[in-house]
């Protein structure tokens, strides 16, 4: 594994073997609007391993329209997509349903107005999450337990091959059994914490043998 640093953004080159030859997937960490613009200005669409976009505290806000331009630059994500501190991000639609994220894991952290997660309702793409599925300090996220989003949001997930964590989601959850009605397997930690309007958690017998921590 070889780490390559530039003055614009951090790139991690990860080799992999496919069809008898060695290729490389880059991982990118983009800090702030200027680094995002520099990245999306590139003309080569590529498959990446990990993609992280951060809006540092106190920095210039990153407009949602600029975030969605990632779709012009990234064809597929095979590792983890991380969205952190994005003050203007409201939706996953137009992002994870355009970039091929069917083999990815996801981290959404400290995105105060993120609400629409309905792109995850595509069962063909997202019934299995190939890594972590973490939503942390995104209070406006609408789950499948909200009346207006029943059978939408990320309610179609059946398996998470990493950690599954929901932390500090404060939207209404009128039908808790609808959050993960089909969930059968979590390979990592399963944590529900600080979801103040989720008064109980259940999806029948499915969670009986899962490592669930409900706080």
Locations of the language-model features?
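ATP-binding pocket architecture of kinase catalytic cores
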Residues: 183
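Bacterial Sec-dependent N-terminal signal peptides
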Residues: 1-29
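Disulfide-braced loops of extracellular cysteine-rich modules
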Residues: 36-39, 67, 152
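Concave beta-strand-loop units of leucine-rich repeat
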Residues: 26-33, 49-62, 77-88, 96-113, ...
